[in-house]
Design a protein with these regions (language model features):
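Short glycine/serine/threonine-enriched helix-capping/active-site loop
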Residues: 40-41, 79
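Active-site neighborhoods of divalent-metal-dependent phosphate/nucleic-acid chemistry enzymes
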Residues: 56-62, 66, 70-116, 128
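Residue-level signal for well-ordered alpha-helical positions
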Residues: 19-20, 51, 90, 126
Length: 129
């Protein structure tokens, strides 16, 4: 049996961090399963940091996001030129740069994206919720 691998959308990461019931049972079980490789994009750190700076979000810990991810044993996925180029080339109008980056990473790295954002469906990537 192959090991499951999942890329967390930013809201999934936040909901996991604050133990929010909005996180689906399926995604919660995947994260809790020690055999699942849970991946967090640097784009999520960028998005969270931006929203904290703008006062739109409160990150639940004083630890840096990367340190939190390490404590959770999440893998960190850096953004590459290939990711950036793919994120910029999609023809549809979904304008959120963070979602575009996460979708590009999901497609290129062949990792399903854990998201409940229906707008992501326009990218044609594999999602889990």
């Amino acid at each position: 049996m192959a090991t499951a691998k999942v890329l967390l959308d930013t809201h999934a990461l936040i909901w996991w961090a604050i133990d929010d019931r909005a996180l689906s049972r399926k995604v919660r079980r995947l994260i809790e399963d020690a055999t699942t490789i849970v991946v967090v994009s640097a784009a999520s750190a960028w998005e969270i940091s931006t929203k904290v700076r703008l006062g739109r979000l409160s990150w639940p810990t004083t630890r840096p996001i990367e340190a939190y991810c390490a404590e959770q044993r999440f893998e960190v996925l850096s953004m590459t030129f290939a990711h950036a180029e793919r994120a910029g080339k999609w023809p549809h109008a979904h304008g959120d740069p963070f979602d575009r980056m996460l979708a590009a990473q999901s497609e290129i790295e062949r990792i399903p994206l854990a998201t409940n954002d229906e707008k992501i469906d326009a990218f044609g990537i594999e999602t889990i919720w």
